[in-house]
Amino acid sequence: MKIITCYKCVPDEQDIAINNADGTLDFSKADSKISQYDLNAIEAACQLKQQLGDAQVVAMSVGGKALTNAKGRKDVLSRGPDELIVVIDDQFEQALPQHTATALAAAAQKSGFDLLICGDGSSDLYAQQVGLLVGEALNIPAINGVSKILSLTDSTLTVERELEDEVETLSIPLPAVIAVSTDINTPQIPSMKAILGAAKKPVQVWSPADIGLNSVPAYSTQQVAAPKQRERQRVVIEGDGEEQIAAFVENLRKII
C-alpha cells in the first residue's frame, strides 16, 4: 500500500508585518511552514501506516523556493513519511488551485499510489478545492471533509464525514483521494529521534518538465492589505429608562 500525503508551504503568520502607511502586508521576513491543515493529512497517513504495517507514506508538495529549505523538508519527514517528493518552480508561487491540483495529479501519477490524502484547505488561501480537483484530474473517486477513516483494505476505503445535520459513512474503491478535516486527529510533535532520522530519508526533486508540464498559469496579486482599524468611540450609556434605550438604539444605527 502506497499512501501519498500532500502539503503546502505557507508564510508563518507570526512573521507577517503590516506597513503602517497603506496597510499592505509585508511577507519579506516571514519564514515558511507546513500549512496547519496539512499537518492533519500527514498525521492521518502515518497513522494508517502504523495500522497496516506494510504501507509506505510519501509526502508530496509543489511550490517555489520555499521547498528548497532544508529545515522545512526535515520538518515534514520528521513527522513520519518515508520519502519526500517536491516539484519546484517559481511559477508555482502564484498558481491557482486547479493548476496546483494538475501538478499534484501528474506527480502522483508518476510516483504511483493507492491513496492520496490532502488537508481540507491551506492556511493562506483556504480555497478547499485542491483535493477534489486532484481526484477530477486523475478521474478517480474523491471525498472532502473526512473526519474519520473507518477501514482501509487493498481495494476499498471506508470513511466518515460530518455534515450539518447528519454523519455520512462512505465506501469508495481505490485508488482514491480524500481531504481530511481537523477533527480527524491531533498532529503529534516529532520526537528528537524522528527529527535526527529525517535527514537520512530520501528526497526527490522534480521540475514541471519531469511531470509533463510546460508552463503553469498563475494569478497576479494586486494588493494584500489588512482591514482598516476603527477607533473605539467608548460611548457609555448609564441607566435603563426610555431615554437611555433610545440613545442606545441611535448609537446602534450609526454603526450598522
UniProtKB/Swiss-Prot annotation:
UniProt KW keywords: Electron transport, Transport
Top-level division of the source organism's lineage: Bacteria
PROSITE patterns per UniProt: ETF_BETA
InterPro entries (alphabetical): ET-Flavoprotein_bsu_CS (IPR000049), ETF_a/b_N (IPR014730), ETF_b (IPR012255), ETF_beta_N (IPR033948), FixA (IPR023463), Rossmann-like_a/b/a_fold (IPR014729)
Transmembrane segments: none
Pathway: Amine and polyamine metabolism; carnitine metabolism
MF-aspect GO terms: electron transfer activity
Record's keyword annotation contains Lyase: no
CDD domains documented for this protein: ETF_beta (cd01714)
Biological-process GO terms, alphabetical: carnitine metabolic process
Quaternary organization: Heterodimer of FixA and FixB.
The family this protein is said to belong to: Belongs to the ETF beta-subunit/FixA family.
HAMAP family the record matches: FixA (MF_01055)
Protein purpose: Required for anaerobic carnitine reduction. May bring reductant to CaiA.
Name recorded for this polypeptide: Protein FixA
Organism for this UniProt entry: Salmonella paratyphi A (strain AKU_12601)
